[in-house]
Regions:
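Structural core segment of the AMP-binding/adenylate-forming
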Residues: 207-213, 320-389, 710
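Conserved pre-ATP/AMP-binding loop-to-beta segment of ANL
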Residues: 257-260, 375-376, 381-383, 392-415, ...
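Conserved AMP-binding/adenylate-forming core of the ANL superfamily
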Residues: 258-316, 333-338, 389-392, 430-431
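Conserved AMP-binding A3 loop
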Residues: 272-277, 411-435
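AMP-binding/adenylate-forming catalytic core of the ANL superfamily
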Residues: 332-335, 339, 349-354, 503, ...
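Conserved AMP-binding/adenylation subdomain of ANL enzymes
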Residues: 434-454, 458-501, 516
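Gly/Ser/Thr-rich phosphate-binding loop
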Residues: 473, 500-505, 514-574, 586
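Conserved ATP/PPi-binding loop(s) of AMP-dependent carboxylate-activating enzymes
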Residues: 581-584, 595-632, 670, 713
Length: 758
């Protein structure tokens, strides 16, 4: 009945608009111009084929020289200049979309100084994990809560309003709101505009926008989301022509020259801010500089630059020139450099002046015939070029030409962790950067108005997951702190100080965070937290959420890939799971014979590359100079990750371990991660690594190598306690029959446990 009444009212208004158009002698085209609509839109409104927005009716009344009441009601409504009464449930509905209902409480009152609205805002779980959409309009706004809870953001400040609470703010300040507390929120909004108030003002203020933002990268990326903003599918377009430095960095600089690209702190916390224009010009100078040194397309150039801001100038310059960037950590020693220089045929290196790194390079140089150019950053040294002084002498323009690198040309190489042998060289094309759009947009939850902080140092692949490609594809800024040693108490105050909105760190650092008293720090600016690098123990997840209210969204990928599995924005997550497969990757779990395993059974995570999707943007091109190793992991249309997981009935994946790490005991296949997670629940355990130990009867048994917290003594009684705890909290056959206490666990340079040395 109510729907029918409203429909009849709108039909009557549409008929009066048509009548008045004929009386005034306007054509549909003229009225479309008067109401700022297209002719097609105007015709639909007048014919009653579409709901009539209040703004449209208001503009029609102005064009006809009528009061809006005359047009809406068909009478003069003179009394509406002194007062108006709106009975319960009788307000004029002006918007009902995206979980929002807005009713104007005084639609016919003349010469209003403000617009009062009755607003119902549905609770949306997905909205709890996204940044609040912010908007502006002229004047001021007053909101009072009638029922439920409303989370309101005004500028950088956030308030939770309960029943009876109210807020008044300048609506020219960016603001937005969502319902919280698990149920809908009903409130009264009064919009006081500097100009004539209309329905459009409150819609822009109150109705939340969709999650999609218009990015320049949409020439190359097409995403489809559901009504909650969850990613359904994503395709890449024009990827064969793509070059991140030209098509993203330079394009943003051209359109938004003053937009912040990076906020950088050096080790002394000296702050520098770089716009996209700064990055564009500095990378052009770097490209011209490298070219003058004889570096050319296809040359391999190593970057050992910690978190120095010059890293961004250099890598973008190499991307423009076509030389292949090879990031590496400053922890390398002589033999590490010697192996890498020769394995990749490194011809030039940009190296930090900090510490002993340059000396280690010089020691390795004598056995590295391909290395001809050494460039120092942050200092000077005999036999080295000085980057900071020399690159500034070159032009800040570097034109794109017909032979500029793009698409399938090699852009980047990473050395793998080397947990089972010498590190391999994973080679990536220019399409790799596009693959990280999902990483940033749907996992990190990066938006153009935010600042993202990924902890990782630039020598690791994870740094480029979170400090460059995806974040700038989303036109967001990155925060970089060039610290030497991780200290939770040093980093935690930075979130509030620099209004960091999204954050990513490995599980180890979250473990360090939860050992701090987090109540001492203001972490309210953080909208979203993520982790990757190793599986996250559920206990760490629970403790971090208990102390901060933030859930940690886990993701999975490799040096050879972009994000392949993850807990994405808009989807519910299960604590301890890896999440679901990313739409751009066709994932399958297989047994040792390559057959797909049923749900609930362990299988190796593989990526199909022989389907219509082909090789996805983000998957590596192969191991450089190592065809045999490439064929070993990539054959019969499958790329084998060597990681084992199982999938539940809802499609979530659960990590078991590396294929080489799975323990085979008495016919059981036991993943080390599950046992490690249980042992890590014990308050006196600092670190734990589970591995296989040979056994004459069972073939293998579970061995737990444990590092205790300072002050805790490892005893036989403690071993028994740990064994009994595992028996109680998981299947008894999985308990560690061998428990050893160690001062530290053997790890790779990247910090991953080397299980075959336990």
């Amino acid at each position: 009945m109510e729907t029918s009444r409203v429909a009849n009212q709108l039909a009557e208004v549409a008929f009066r608009i048509k009548e008045m158009r004929h009386i005034c002698g306007f054509t549909e085209a003229e009225m479309a111009a008067n109401t700022d609509t297209t002719v097609e839109q105007y015709h639909a409104y007048e014919a009653g084929l579409a709901d009539l927005p209040f703004t449209f009716i208001h503009k029609c009344a102005l064009a006809f020289g009528l009061g809006i009441t005359d047009l809406l009601e068909g009478h003069s409504g003179a009394h509406l200049m002194s007062y108006t009464v709106t009975r319960k449930g009788a307000g004029q509905q002006t918007a009902k979309e995206q979980g929002i209902s807005i009713c104007n409480l005084a639609p016919y009152f003349r010469n209003k100084l403000a617009e009062p609205y009755y607003v119902t805002y549905e609770y949306d779980e997905a909205q709890q994990h996204r940044p609040i959409h912010l908007t502006t309009h002229s004047g001021q706004e007053f909101d009072i809560i009638l029922s439920g809870q409303l989370k309101v953001q005004v500028g950088e400040h956030t308030e939770i309003l309960n029943e009876g609470d109210s807020i008044l703010y300048n609506s020219s300040t960016p603001h937005g709101m969502i319902a919280v507390g698990g149920k809908e929120c009903v409130f009264c909004a009064v919009v006081m505009s500097g100009e004539e108030a209309d329905e459009r003002s409150v819609r822009e203020s109150i109705v939340r926008a969709g999650t999609s933002e218009e990015y320049l990268c949409q020439k190359f990326v097409h995403a489809v989301e559901d009504e909650k903003g969850a990613l359904k599918s994503l395709t890449f377009e024009n990827a064969d022509e793509y070059n991140f430095a030209f098509d993203t960095v330079d394009a943003i600089a051209a359109k938004y020259p003053d937009k912040l690209a990076m906020l950088h702190l050096d080790h002394n916390k000296v702050e520098r801010r770089f716009t996209f224009t700064d990055m564009s010009k500095a990378s052009n100078r770097a490209a011209n500089y490298f070219k003058s040194l004889g570096i050319k397309k296809g040359d391999r150039v190593m970057l050992v630059l910690k978190r120095h801001y010059q890293f961004w100038f250099a890598i973008l310059g190499l991307h423009k020139l076509g030389a292949i960037a090879v990031p590496a950590t400053n922890l390398l020693q002589e033999h590490d450099f010697t192996y890498r220089f020769n394995a990749a045929g490194i011809s030039a290196i940009l190296c930090t002046a900090d510490g002993d790194v340059a000396h280690q390079v010089e020691l390795a140089e004598k056995d590295s015939p391909t290395l001809t150019t050494k460039i120092l950053v942050g200092g000077s040294r005999e036999g080295w070029h000085n980057f900071d002084e020399e690159y500034l002498m070159y032009r800040s323009s570097f034109p794109r030409t017909a032979d500029s690198p793009k698409g399938d040309d090699l852009m980047l190489m990473f050395f793998t962790s080397g947990t089972t042998g010498y590190p391999k060289i994973a080679a990536h094309s220019y399409k790799y950067a596009l693959g990280h759009y999902i990483t940033a947009k749907y996992w990190h939850c990066v938006h153009s108005d935010g600042i993202h902080f990924t902890i990782s140092e630039t020598g690791w692949g994870k740094a480029l997951w979170g400090k460059l490609y995806g974040q700038w594809l989303c036109e967001g800024a990155v925060f970089t702190y060039d610290f030497d040693k991780f200290d939770a108490a040093d980093i935690l105050p930075l979130f509030k100080q620099y209004n960091i909105t999204t954050f990513c760190a490995p599980p180890t650092m979250y473990r360090m965070f939860i050992k701090e008293d987090l109540s001492k720090y203001d972490l309210s600016s953080i909208r979203h937290a993520t982790t990757a690098g190793e599986a996250l123990n559920p206990e760490v997840f629970r403790q971090f959420e208990a102390q901060t209210g933030l859930q940690i969204y886990e993701g999975f990928g490799q040096t050879e890939t972009t994000l392949t599995i993850g807990n994405l924005v808009g989807n519910a997550q299960k604590i301890g799971s890896m999440g679901k497969p990313i739409p751009t990757y066709d994932l399958v779990l297989v047994d040792a014979d390559g057959n797909e395993v049923p749900r609930g059974e362990n299988g190796e995570i593989c990526i199909r590359t022989d389907t219509e999707k082909g090789v996805p943007c983000g998957l590596f091109a192969g191991y450089y100079r190592d065809e045999a190793q490439t064929k070993e992991v990539w054959h019969d249309g499958l790329y084998h990750t060597r990681d084992v997981a199982w999938q539940d009935e809802d499609g979530y994946l659960w990590y078991v371990g590396r294929a080489d790490d799975v323990i085979k005991s008495s016919g059981y296949r036991i993943g080390p991660f599950e046992i490690e997670s249980v042992i890590m629940e014990l308050p006196y355990v600092l670190e734990c690594g589970v591995s296989a130990a040979p056994d004459e009867i069972r073939g293998q048994v579970v061995k737990a190598s444990i590092v205790l917290v300072k002050g805790k003594e490892g005893t036989e009684e403690l071993k028994k306690e740990i064994q009994n705890y595992v028996k109680k909290h998981t299947a008894p056959y999985k308990y560690p029959r061998i428990v050893v206490f160690r001062d530290e666990l053997p790890k790779t340079i990247s910090g991953k446990i080397i299980r075959n040395k336990l």
